Amino acid sequence: MRPLSPPPAGWFCVLAGVLACVLGPVGSWAVGLQQEECDYLQMIKVQHKQCLEEAQLENETSGCSKMWDNLTCWPATPRGQVVVLACPLIFKLFSPTQGLNVSRNCTDEGWTPLEPGPYPIACGMDDKASGLDEQQTVFYNSVKTGYTIGYSLSLAALLVATAILSLFRKLHCTRNYIHMHLFISFILRATAVFIKDLALFDSEESDHCSKGSVGCKAAVVLFQYCVMANFFWLLVEGLYLHTLLAVSFFSERKYFWGYIFVGWGVPSTFIMVWTVVRIHFEDYGCWDTIHSSLWWIIKAPILASILVNFILFIRIIGILVQKLRPPDVGKSDNSPYSRLAKSTLLLIPLFGVHYIMFAFFPDNFKAEVKMVFELIVGSFQGCVVAILYCFLNGEVQAELRRKWRRWHQQGVLGWDSKYQHPSGGSNGDTCSTQVSMLTRVSPSARRSSSFQAEVSLV
């Protein structure tokens, strides 16, 4: 009998994807196959090639010819004999029972189906694994839907907020420039998530072990850069606000370019190093695996930024406590505590303080809870930041009302702008009264006014 024809080229991709889904919640399988699993799949490819070459060299027999069934090479066998082989080695990674065998019988009609059943059942992956696979599929689809909604809302809100801060010149100042860069980092992060999902899940590049395409790797590199840049711009927000409160006098223009370097330059440095190292040492798959020592090139700077921002957050809350403390100790006044609570809640999304909850836990600790918190809750952070620091900002609302009154008057009364009375100040007055002109007052008054501009909702 003739040997079976080779399986389609994408069969190994399907095998890798199925094995990844079957293992469900354990951390490594949630994102892709590790190097050990990839080694097994590579071994299967080698065995497949060797089996087909040997089958072509063998003479025709009256029994069953050598056959490759996508996992095991069955030797040429006379009719009437049963061949018993051990389960493929790859099943030992996730089957609790070891030492299981599979068999086929050579008959006049050829090889019989696999006994005692298909590989998943015969080698220890039974209904429990299938049920787990189905549950995890539902869970991951729900998570993907959740963060897709969150990033979509954030993207829409951030685009509008960035346009507002960019178009109205009276809102141009260092503080709002930093806000705009933070908004842009959130926009890039949301966009990169959609591109990565398109490259990894909505395309045929599901094999995490073969050499991925340049486009797929580029999508992952872009995603990692945007995520790191977003964390570093959260750090810049913390550094800027802390500097306003702690430093008597400083050049905002000089510091601003330093903030630009921290927000965009530092992440690009780490990502370039990570990219070069992966090309030389782990250039397999689509670079979406995170369970190797190389992942710390990205993870360590992000953890450091989260920790520093949390420390800055605690220090700023301490300054708030001092500033909002009632002057009369004997007087009972709940207003300062209410303002402190509002200020704290206002700063949490700006500093990304919520990330500290799971930042220093192992990746496989409460993996599903961590995934929901970081992916779904984190996806709405950009929307919350845009609402708090643009749409609910007093300066923005005042400028929008002023523009609306002018447009309304021009539309209803036909007024021309050249006949309008000049505004009370030049472009940028709104921000200059909040930040730039603070250099003309005492350090304590300057720090107080600047901070009040940040927490104008309180």
From Swiss-Prot:
Residues 1-31 form the signal peptide. InterPro entries: GPCR_2, GPCR_2-like_7TM, GPCR_2_extracell_dom_sf, GPCR_2_extracellular_dom, GPCR_2_secretin-like, GPCR_2_secretin-like_CS, GPCR_2_VIP_rcpt, GPCR_2_VIP_rcpt_1. It is a multi-pass membrane protein. Disulfide bonds join 38-209, 51-73, 64-106, 87-123, 216-286. Belongs to the G-protein coupled receptor 2 family. G protein-coupled receptor activated by the neuropeptides vasoactive intestinal peptide (VIP) and pituitary adenylate cyclase-activating polypeptide (ADCYAP1/PACAP). Binds VIP and both PACAP27 and PACAP38 bioactive peptides with the following order of ligand affinity VIP = PACAP27 > PACAP38. Ligand binding causes a conformation change that triggers signaling via guanine nucleotide-binding proteins (G proteins) and modulates the activity of downstream effectors. Activates cAMP-dependent pathway. GO terms for molecular function: G protein-coupled peptide receptor activity; peptide hormone binding; vasoactive intestinal polypeptide receptor activity. Keywords: Cell membrane, Disulfide bond, G-protein coupled receptor, Glycoprotein, Membrane, Receptor, Signal, Transducer, Transmembrane, Transmembrane helix. This is Vasoactive intestinal polypeptide receptor 1. Glycans are attached at residues 59, 70, 101, 105. Residues 32-142, 198-217, 278-292, 361-368 are extracellular. The keyword Cell division does not apply.
